[in-house]
Regions:
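Internal intein/HINT superfamily modules and their associated LAGLIDADG
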Residues: 1-290
Length: 290
């Protein structure tokens, strides 16, 4: 091999790699399929940085969902690989998985521009700060890390476990826009996560918005969404009356008095007062307006 300045040409190119052009443009995040893919990757993918310009985006899911990774591969016009593997876990023997890996620096930089952190990210993820397709983004996140189905009692639900406060705020605002209802959710004491559960008619409204005809989605979750769309409330199932809205005076009283005093004065349950106080304090800590 011919040498130049004491090193081989191969070594020179390794030390001075050509910059990788972006596979996609930042503005393409507004496209439904791209927003969906980004939401899915944010929920279940892992962005790793190595030395220099090395690194990769990797996402591993059950082999039965290989279809969705093939769709992602077709959306990203740069080299990537899809590989299958079989391993035993604490829960399943001979678990079959499929992984999609992209090393292209331009694509990895684009994911960072959109807001995807490297390494552990569950507690800091949030919706993109630039224009994106909201419905498709949250469908991607739910397909990647949520559940869609029926309870043992036959009630439809859409469930999503969230760690990040920023992502929770965005998702609750999205749910309010779809269902017309404001939700207050507290972290579970055991796992320190938010479990956002949408059920019954609200679940029907949500899947109608999320899983629209022709959208990119996991086929099995699209099938479940179709089943939820057909659900009707049993005649003998009572409809829970709407809760009383919180006024500015109520909010001020809760912040200035004890839980028991607030329960008696406002005529509300312990859980209602406790959740409201937690939400108000978090809004104040984040610089929000109460």
């Amino acid at each position: 091999m011919e040498r130049c300045s004491g090193i081989t040409l191969d070594e020179y190119h390794r030390r001075h790699p050509k910059p990788s052009p972006p596979c996609l443009s930042p503005e393409q995040l507004i496209e439904p399929a791209i927003s969906y893919m980004y939401g899915f990757l944010l929920a279940d993918g892992h962005l790793r940085d190595g030395s220099g310009q090395k690194g990769s985006l990797c996402i591993s899911i059950a082999a039965r969902d290989r279809y969705i990774l093939e769709q992602f591969q077709s959306l990203v016009p740069c080299y990537s690989s899809i590989r299958e593997a079989t391993r035993s876990t604490n829960f399943v023997v001979d678990y079959e998985s499929v992984a999609w890996q992209v090393s292209n620096l331009g694509f990895r930089n684009l994911l960072k521009l959109w807001g995807m952190p490297s390494g552990r990210k569950k507690s800091i993820v949030q919706a993109p700060m630039m224009p994106f397709s909201t419905v498709d983004f949250y469908r991607g996140f739910i397909d990647g890390d949520g559940s869609v189905g029926f309870t043992g009692a036959g009630l439809p639900f859409v469930s999503l476990v969230i760690v990040s406060d920023a992502l929770l705020d965005g998702y609750l605002a999205f749910l309010k826009n779809i269902t017309g209802k404001e939700r207050s959710v507290m972290r579970s004491k055991r796992d320190n996560v938010y479990n956002v559960m949408v059920m019954r008619e609200d679940a029907c409204l949500l899947v109608n918005a999320l899983y629209y005809k022709g959208c990119l989605a996991l086929p099995r979750k699209m099938d479940m969404a179709d089943a939820i769309r057909k659900w009707c409330r049993p005649i003998d199932m009572k409809i829970k009356p709407k809760g009383r809205p919180w006024t500015d005076a109520d909010n001020a009283y809760v912040l200035e008095h004890s839980l028991s005093e607030s329960m008696i004065k406002l005529g509300r349950t312990f859980n209602a007062v406790n959740i409201r106080r937690h939400k108000l304090r978090r809004m104040m800590n984040d610089g929000g307006v109460v």
